[in-house]
């Protein structure tokens, strides 16, 4: 009897041991399955995250803009830029090539008249440009803000010698003077011989000659320009209505701008008539209008000087509205910075700009 019980006990123990092994195998199998499932899930999550990241990259694709007009580009703009003085005496009109300037300045010189400065990029396609006139210190100052060469014909004692104000000379004056490099300019003989223009109103250059001069003088460095300007197709700002804007210079000369709602641009007029580009016959028009107020003082011979480093007030007009702004500039080779009165960076409309530098005892009139 005892032998039978012992045998039964051994059999029971063997059966229990087998059951335990089967459970361990089952648990191990379940654990491996769980781990595999977890791995698959992690891979799927990574795929989802990867797709989300790719989607995010597409949505956040960087937008490249032209540094002076804000036009959208496929890649960063790497071109060359230069500026030319433009004679604006009544007897010198019409001017040529000016409608293709990206930025167009007007500043009062001596005698109560104004002179203009046209800033061009990729100027090879521009035809005749001018009439070209002599330089002044403030033209040297403004072109230094862009770090671009100035095309001119002689100048005042200060303007022709690289001064950027009444006391300081540019460390590196980048310029092309017709008196030194006449090969990049030409005289319009028809103007002088048949049309009754004075000699000083007959000097021109061309976009092609400007580009050639930049290459010959080593000024054609193609770099990524960044002047710190912000642009939008439709700038948002709380301005007053301004369909008519009149710039009044210290000597009384005016420049009038009328907003054309059909084109979204301000059309220029001076001397009692439309401001015309003689090369195309079109009226000068601008997306942005800026008036920058600063101290204007006079030296020998009535020469004007302007404080263009520091800060001041101004006005900005775009899309039929106008708002007060502030401008600042920290150093001679630094660009102008524009903000709203509360310090918010100013956003310009995509397109070209007219900029008037005027005495801070003057202002603009608008309605």
Placement of each model-derived feature along the sequence:
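Short, intrinsically disordered low-complexity segments
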Residues: 2, 38-45, 50, 186, ...
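Sec-dependent signal peptide recognition
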Residues: 2-9
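Short N-terminal leader segment in a subset of presequences, especially plant chloroplast
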Residues: 11-12, 191
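Polar/charged alpha-helical tracts
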Residues: 12, 22-23, 27, 212-216
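C-terminal motif of bacterial Sec signal peptides marking the signal peptidase cleavage site
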Residues: 14-17
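N-terminal, intrinsically disordered, polar/charged segments of Gram-positive cell-envelope systems
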Residues: 22-70
